[in-house]
From Swiss-Prot:
<feature type="active site">
    <location>
        <position position="179"/>
    </location>
</feature>
<dbReference type="InterPro" id="IPR022955">
    <property type="entry name" value="GMP_synthase"/>
</dbReference>
<dbReference type="GO" id="GO:0005524">
    <property type="term" value="F:ATP binding"/>
</dbReference>
<keyword id="KW-0332">GMP biosynthesis</keyword>
<dbReference type="Pfam" id="PF02540">
    <property type="entry name" value="NAD_synthase"/>
</dbReference>
<feature type="domain" description="Glutamine amidotransferase type-1">
    <location>
        <begin position="4"/>
        <end position="205"/>
    </location>
</feature>
<dbReference type="InterPro" id="IPR029062">
    <property type="entry name" value="Class_I_gatase-like"/>
</dbReference>
<keyword id="KW-0067">ATP-binding</keyword>
<dbReference type="InterPro" id="IPR014729">
    <property type="entry name" value="Rossmann-like_a/b/a_fold"/>
</dbReference>
<keyword id="KW-0436">Ligase</keyword>
<dbReference type="InterPro" id="IPR025777">
    <property type="entry name" value="GMPS_ATP_PPase_dom"/>
</dbReference>
<feature type="domain" description="GMPS ATP-PPase">
    <location>
        <begin position="206"/>
        <end position="398"/>
    </location>
</feature>
<dbReference type="InterPro" id="IPR017926">
    <property type="entry name" value="GATASE"/>
</dbReference>
<keyword id="KW-0547">Nucleotide-binding</keyword>
<dbReference type="InterPro" id="IPR022310">
    <property type="entry name" value="NAD/GMP_synthase"/>
</dbReference>
<keyword id="KW-0658">Purine biosynthesis</keyword>
<dbReference type="InterPro" id="IPR004739">
    <property type="entry name" value="GMP_synth_GATase"/>
</dbReference>
Amino acid sequence: MHQRILILDYGSQVTQLIARRVREAGVYSEIHAGDVDDAFVRDQVAQGLKGIILSGSHASAYEEGSMRVPAAVFEVGVPVLGICYGMQSMAQQLGGTVSFSDHREFGYAEVRAHGHTKLLDGLADFTTDEGHGMLKVWMSHGDKVTELPPGFKLMASTASCPIAGMADEDRGFYAVQFHPEVTHTVQGKAMLARFVKDICGCEGDWNMPDYISEAVARIREQVGSDEVILGLSGGVDSSVAAALIHRAIGDQLTCVFVDHGLLRLDEGKQVMQTFAENMGVKIVHVDATSQFMGKLTGVADPEAKRKIIGREFVEVFQDEAGKLQGAKWLAQGTIYPDVIESAGAKTGKATSIKSHHNVGGLPDTLNLQLLEPLRELFKDEVRELGVALGLPPQMVYRHPFPGPGLGVRILGEVKHEYAELLRRADAIFIEELRNAKDPASGLTWYELTSQAFAVFLPVKSVGVMGDGRTYEYVVALRAVQTFDFMTADWAPLPHPLLARVSSRIINEVRGINRVVYDVSSKPPATIEWE
């Protein structure tokens, strides 16, 4: 079993970032709700737990009814790191004082380190004229610790928060008022790595080659000689799940690839070539274009389109699954954020993680057991796994694509003609993004954008081509940059790149005579148009 760090979640929006930073240090971490009982904590320690991290929260530590840290956390003898609310709870429960702050801190702050603690010693972003090392951090709090608990010493301070960090190094307790897990805290990654390795004593035994070996062994033990069926969409999660399961059990896996006529250009061919031809995976390729297009005729409402596409997918998949009489397992590309959300860990009030996470909407009447080989991994780890399994990087690192496909990138009613025009326009846009490099970073603009695509607008505009008048459709280009997809900024693509994309689309895709670029951020707009 890998060395582990337990993260207790009290409802912070960035708790998952803590787990990701710990794993980036090569240490396995798990998130559990903050209201677990003492027995759970003691059991974790008995199984070799190396340390505990307490997350932030929107709640107030000193208000009645606020979630308390299990007492066992401070009794079992492993190092503990409290972050924001975690620091306040630690102080409150160990004899310190927490008060409402007259000067709330939200955003950047400059913190001075004190006391040469193991956590912060030697870390600094700049030095003051007086020689004090200073850290650039991200704060988000309305309460603050005003009196240290017995045994603690001051570890950090700001002008408006005299106790911005504290430590009881004899017991291995550390706490900071700022958020080391977010990228805005420059030394945050180093702090968390120092906590899990230098303070908790983790060696960093979490790596992808070992994970593959362990996952393959688990799948073989779980499945035995049974048959497995998987709905392959061509997306990252289902593709990596298929590659991993096939590595484990070979021809016991059958993938069902449903082409609803709303995929990207040549996507069906790429999936078949990658999995069937190159990797030898058994794939049932179902061309259900006519079925989907027929059901979408006359439907303009975005939500109605999504429901129709989802319902028809389930129907097609069910039909194909029924033909595979020996299948006893349904495999899904469920990943760790899905598991956390299904447990309600975002609220910090869930007590257990559900074992069944039916993200695909497939009915329980299939009577299949669930196989989720990626449920321990974050998205970036899934991509790393995909490359290690031999999947093409352009498949593993492709931008997100909605389940309904082009159905929600064609505004209004979906028609075969519209889908063909959009497919070709979108392919040109993506090709140019992949070919265009930003000289400052050396990266392509495809790598610099988090998501990019074309949108078909079912309106016509007047144009001139040669000596003739045209009256053809409009395409909008959308490219955004984001860390978490909760908020997003439109990408500042170079004008020559946009001009090249526009020229190619208008000249190569007959039926389109105007291209526009979407400069809306999220919020107020959403990333997708529908």
